[in-house]
């Protein structure tokens, strides 16, 4: 079992139950999935860029990646319907907790000029989204073998009903929020 999953069950859930004054431990908010998305607009000119992005995201997550395609043609962006324009992957269960552990303990401290995560990046329903400017903060990526620096979006979907519950959950996981 993943280390953070065990910490959640034994320490975080009982603490949050008391803090949020919930009656049942099943009411305690939990993280259900983590979605990583890499939008690649420059893939229009070169199809190899998608392959490199797929390889990077697969190294980071250890899971097969889905290539996203344009739903409709947009002349202003020179995009045709069905063209690959991004990659995404959804992590659940043990892989999700292992990724979260690596993100919090290894990757975020490697971000240049890191001053903490924005505590206002919640969506109103307890889900948290953050952006990473460079994929090289992850130790799985070899700096010498990347073709370009690419950012990615990370979304943590929780069962929290409000932003305050979601914030309490992520603070319990020791997320480094800015004050």
From Swiss-Prot:
Belongs to the universal ribosomal protein uL5 family. SUPFAM superfamilies: RL5-like (SSF55282). Part of the 50S ribosomal subunit; part of the 5S rRNA/L5/L18/L25 subcomplex. Contacts the 5S rRNA and the P site tRNA. Forms a bridge to the 30S subunit in the 70S ribosome. GO terms for molecular function: rRNA binding; structural constituent of ribosome; tRNA binding. PANTHER family: 60S RIBOSOMAL PROTEIN L11-RELATED. GO terms for biological process: translation. GO terms for cellular component: ribonucleoprotein complex; ribosome. PROSITE patterns: RIBOSOMAL_L5 (PS00358). This is Large ribosomal subunit protein uL5. InterPro entries: Ribosomal_uL5, Ribosomal_uL5_bac-type, Ribosomal_uL5_C, Ribosomal_uL5_CS, Ribosomal_uL5_dom_sf, Ribosomal_uL5_N. NCBIfam families: PRK00010.1. The gene is rplE. Keywords: Ribonucleoprotein, Ribosomal protein, RNA-binding, rRNA-binding, tRNA-binding. This is one of the proteins that bind and probably mediate the attachment of the 5S RNA into the large ribosomal subunit, where it forms part of the central protuberance. In the 70S ribosome it contacts protein S13 of the 30S subunit (bridge B1b), connecting the 2 subunits; this bridge is implicated in subunit movement. Contacts the P site tRNA; the 5S rRNA and some of its associated proteins might help stabilize positioning of ribosome-bound tRNAs.
